[in-house]
Amino acid sequence: MKDHILSVKEKIGYGMGDAASHIIFDNVMLYMMFFYTDIFGIPAGFVGTMFLLARALDAISDPCMGLLADRTRSRWGKFRPWILFGAIPFGLVCVLAYSSPDLSHNGKLIYAAVTYTLLTLLYTVVNIPYCALGGVITDNPTQRISLQSWRFVLATAGGMLSTVLMMPLVNFIGGEDKALGFQGGIAVLSVIAFLMLAFCFFTTKERVEAPPSSTSMREDLRDIWRNDQWRVVGVLTILNILAVCVRGGAMMYYTTWIMGSAALFTAFLTTYCVGNLIGSALAKPLTDWKCKVSVFWWTNALLAVLSVAMFFVPMDAEITMFVFIFVIGVLHQLVTPIQWVMMSDTVDYGEWCNGKRLTGISFAGTLFVSKLGLASGRRADRLDAGRGGYDAAAKTQNSATLTIIIALFTLVPAVCYLLSAVIAKRYYTLKTPFLKKMMAELAEGARRNEQDFTAAPIDKEWQN
């Protein structure tokens, strides 16, 4: 099965699943706060608290969904059924969350809290099995990179489709009635997302089977935490999300106050996203040429250097800024597919260590720490902007505020990239030679713990 070559159709099908997720996720990230405050008419403070509590709920729902998926048995596999049968309620709740029923003030607060919580839970129901699916479609390292490259090309395209189409749909469907427009716009996008998820279900196949296990959920959680390589990838995930979240949160401020025009935001973001598309496509050929771990840490090191260099770009060098953000977009998205393959490798490593393949809970944990990184990045933006004396009503900002905006856009991501490079080089040991040895032993039914895995260190010969 390691020699199985995935068809382009299956790679596109798998990528369609993440395109569907990003159609909804990117839309919620960009428009939902505005919808709640300006269309539905509820206080921004309540909305912020609601978003924060949803992240707290993820601490419970994400691992529970991963554990549940790992224990699913069906003729369609462990993960694919959740994608198909979760898609319809997910789409319906999206429409409900963007609806504006005529309720009292308290009724609106309750309605928003209930529908947003349901939206968060159903996103978890669909997305965690989807992410885990990438680890069981194939165990071929080369094919995994190719699969994840297709995934992130299509995910980026899905996010761009959603953010570009939403407001034209709102205006076309609702006209002056923005409440109707938002409801209709998300309904159209939800139908598109459902069709993509259905296509993902029907064109993919689970091939990597987990050995039988009768352990408890508590034991599974213990075993996944004992997987040192999973912990390393978890830290790398937080750093990756922090970098993109802090930079993304500062982008509007950067284009408005540093580049001098809020109108440049769309072009700047589009340039970055086009770079993302190219970066995703480059992951496969580069990792064919060089060990993916080396590509990962070298790329992060280069991102750190470029981000620091961008700090010193003059404020009037508009073209230079566009060149920088394009190259950074390419390099950042180049490492993202590699990082997801590294997560799949940690699942194989866990099976090799203790005979248990914990795909669902492994990916659930990674998604949860990515949400922690997302929340931390948003908090960093708010905290530092506040300390700099930012005044949205002012015609100009003071020098301290401008320096903080530039630092958030450049230096904070640079620190994240540098830490990622150092941690990956120093602590991530699942490099190509060792992986080949490990996968060969798994194929033969051998496990490290059959020789006492708790005491024996990994052979240094295979770490390099």
Residue locations for each model-derived region?
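Membrane-embedded alpha-helical bundles of multi-pass transporters/translocases
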Residues: 2-464
